Amino acid sequence: MNYLAERRQEEKERRRAEILDAAEAVAASVGWDALTMDQVGRRARLSRALLYVYFKDKVDLMYGICERGLATMRQRFTEAVGRHRLGLDQILGIGRAYIAFSQEFPVHFDILARCELREVSAEDATPSEAACQAEGGALQVLMVGVLEAGVRDGSIRPDLGDPRVVANSLWGMTHGVVQLASTKAKILALHGVDGRAVIEQMMVMARRALVAQQ
């Protein structure tokens, strides 16, 4: 790639990042449902036509934000793994990192939840959707590797079955409980239940399900 081509690519990546920054800011202000592409364009100071060069529609833009969020999450997961020696503590650390991510990046977590509800496009995925899927796949690989390491070091029970199934089960459980505690906090409180206690109970149950018997 020559110098001019590199500059054009850098400019394209910079502008795409600015669009995503703008979309996240608008979403934080008005919510994703109320967000419009025109609002994002104004925030990014781009014409409507140029905005659609980078993202074909609002759903495509959503996947762009999702990819960003998952990349940040993967970084947090990796850091959590590095803080522990045993696989059990590493996978529980990943769970804690997920909880912290949902609280620190509410826009990303909301977008992630929305993407979770959509059918995966295998053949006609946009570049943003494909990149989002790739980041999600990398997270799964990381979790599976930690589970396998935990079985090898004796901290995770060996009879759980396919670690890919276990990883997806843990992901679904953690995501569902965190979302419940976030979106249903007031309803839970009416019944005398603290959403934070629900999350903590989920972590206790996860540990009991995973820990190897001594």
Predicted regions and their residues:
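Hydrophobic alpha-helical connector segments
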Residues: G64, T78-H108, A130, P163, ...
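Hydrophobic/aromatic-rich alpha-helical bundle segments in the mid-to-C-terminal region
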Residues: F109-D110, R114, E129, Q133, ...
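Short hydrophobic/aromatic patch on the recognition helix
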Residues: R45-F55
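Alpha-helical DNA-contacting segments of helix-turn-helix folds
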Residues: M62-G69, L112
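Basic, helix-initiating cap at the start of DNA-binding domains
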Residues: M1-V30, A34-R43, D60-Y63
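Helical hydrophobic small-molecule/effector-binding pocket
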Residues: L92-S121, Q140-G145, W171-V178, A212
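Short hydrophobic clusters on alpha-helical segments that form packing/core surfaces
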Residues: I19-A27, G69, Y98, S102
